[in-house]
């Protein structure tokens, strides 16, 4: 496909997305404003700002990174895009950060004034001095989330390219894993691999966690040196044209797992493979998570870390001490993509469900992460109240032997298809 053909395909995809959204929104008859957002200043850093990323709801319907822009929809007249002019000073210091095709942003006020008395709702980033019906906006967002969860061909093509860059980054970093190498050095290698293979940026702050740091779910890399016999957990991904990849692998620093590490790794891998197999259209994601929690609980019983019935251990929260998060989340336009809860469903406070990020039936076109993990976090397992509460379900003598173990997580991105699924990140070895 030539560059011109690709641009035409993107244009057609945007038109299809807008038509699909129109069919949802027209019933409400609401004027909709979708803000791209503005650059965010870095506190105390003079005129520096964080790298700009347009709000995902705006980007989805424009494919533009335009600071300060607003996409407007009037069911009676269609779509309009209002774009700020780029000043001479901005061109001097930063160049043309975006194209200016569209209606001048100064015309948004008069455009709204001509629609005075009609209901207006805002999506995307907040638009100063513009009205918004909050309740209607929530309904519009629910409709948009439902559409956005199903990835079209352009989105999937970008996600595959992000996955390719991610695969290249892991391939570049893994040979450097050795005692005496710092977490930061591994971050440099993996992210350089992303960029060398076409990534625009990283999908999120890379997690490089060695030794006990691997028990911290979102540990940021430091100058800590990897120790012989330890584990190192790498959770990182590339972004391409707004679309993200999110992968985790866990490696033995010295090249081979110890017996204890191998047993826990085999359990996590077994749980992940079973969860991926369950990822099919029509299956409730909550059920995939709960089945994984049961598998973890039974595996910890078999390994001698827990005692009792697996179902009871999940319900009582004993297994959540070691598997504290959900099985995954939506991924795509952003590392955590469009809303994962159906209307009328809310988060549960049950120990095994507190951090569940998706509660809906899977559909073809959804892309989710599947990322079970088992951790031995000292701040949890050394808490006297937790030890007292779970004295009958946790075999503390066995658990205490794994102080400093850290944790193991394995994560892949799974596309739901008619009749099955496809693992987009299968090119990154995990055994």
What are these regions (language model features)?
Residues 1-431:
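Active-site neighborhoods and metal-handling regions in enzymes and metal-associated proteins
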């Amino acid at each position: 496909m030539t560059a011109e053909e690709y641009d035409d395909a993107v244009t057609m995809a945007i038109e299809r997305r807008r038509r699909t959204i129109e069919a949802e929104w027209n019933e409400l008859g609401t004027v909709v404003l979708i803000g791209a957002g503005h650059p965010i200043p870095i506190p105390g850093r003079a005129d520096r700002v964080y790298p700009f990323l347009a709000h995902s709801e705006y980007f989805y319907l424009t494919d533009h990174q335009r600071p300060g822009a607003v996409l407007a929809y009037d069911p009676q007249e269609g779509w309009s895009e209002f774009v700020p002019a780029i000043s001479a000073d901005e061109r001097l210091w930063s160049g043309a950060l975006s194209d200016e095709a569209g209606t001048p942003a100064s015309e948004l006020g008069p455009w709204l004034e001509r629609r005075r008395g009609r209901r207006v709702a805002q999506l995307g980033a907040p638009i100063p001095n513009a009205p918004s019906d909050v309740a209607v906006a929530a309904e519009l967002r629910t409709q948009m989330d439902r559409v956005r969860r199903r990835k079209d061909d352009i989105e999937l093509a970008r996600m595959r390219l992000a996955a390719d860059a991610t695969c290249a980054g892991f391939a570049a970093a893994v040979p450097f894993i050795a005692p005496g190498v710092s977490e930061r050095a591994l971050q440099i290698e993996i992210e350089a691999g992303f960029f060398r293979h076409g990534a625009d940026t990283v999908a999120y702050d890379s997690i490089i966690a060695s030794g006990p740091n691997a028990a911290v779910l979102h540990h940021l890399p430091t100058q800590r040196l990897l120790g012989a016999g330890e584990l190192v957990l790498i959770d990182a991904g590339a972004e391409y044209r707004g679309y993200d990849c999110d992968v985790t692998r866990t490696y033995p620093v010295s090249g081979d797992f110890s017996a204890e590490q191998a047993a826990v790794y085999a359990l996590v891998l077994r749980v992940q493979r079973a969860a991926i197999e369950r990822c099919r259209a029509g299956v409730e994601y909550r059920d995939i998570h709960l089945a994984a929690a049961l598998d973890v609980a039974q595996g910890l019983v078999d390994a001698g870390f827990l005692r009792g019935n697996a179902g009871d251990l999940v319900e009582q929260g004993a297994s959540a001490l070691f598997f504290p998060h959900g099985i995954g989340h939506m991924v795509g336009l952003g590392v955590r993509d469009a809303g994962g809860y159906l209307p009328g469903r809310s988060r549960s406070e049950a120990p095994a469900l507190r951090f569940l990020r998706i509660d809906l039936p899977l559909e073809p076109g959804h892309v989710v992460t599947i990322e079970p993990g088992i951790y031995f976090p000292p701040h949890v397992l050394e808490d006297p109240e937790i030890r007292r509460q779970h004295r009958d379900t946790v075999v503390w003598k066995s658990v205490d032997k794994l102080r400093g173990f850290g944790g193991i997580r394995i994560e892949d991105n799974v596309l739901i298809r008619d009749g099955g699924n496809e693992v987009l990140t299968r090119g990154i070895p995990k055994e």
